[in-house]
Amino acid sequence: GVSNRILDKPAKLTDEEFAEIRKHPAWTLEILNHVSAFRHFSSDAAQHHERLDGRGYPWKIPGEKLSFTARVLAVADVYEALTATRPYRAGLPVAKVIGIMANDRGTAFDSEIFDAAVALAENGTFESLSMVTEDGFEQLQQIVPLASAEEMPARVA
């Protein structure tokens, strides 16, 4: 995986360090494919830095080919990254994070999923999802009904 030296670096990353960061989705795919309990989820997890507009990484998968789960993970990943305190900065307030992420609504993030995440964040439920509570999951399903297996986009591998 990515070295903690890079992940915890308090200064701007070099081009080489950023290139290492951009490899982690491929490592996610490889690692999860070797764990039978997670194999079915590996391509979804690996797509979490892809964007609807096809400008994500590492595979530049266009939105129509991204799985529903990957779209949810993309929103959750950025939200968590911005709200969490890191060695190099304090976590940002939820309102500021929503404002930052809103700039990518419909280009990086699925609009419906982003709107559902905003609703969860505004009522405080999104924070509790880090504990994956049944209540939070049920609220997410009410806001964005989860697609059935037949409706899911094709996975990448």
Where are these regions (language model features)?
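Metal-dependent catalytic cores of enzymes that make or break cyclic nucleotides
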Residues: 1-157
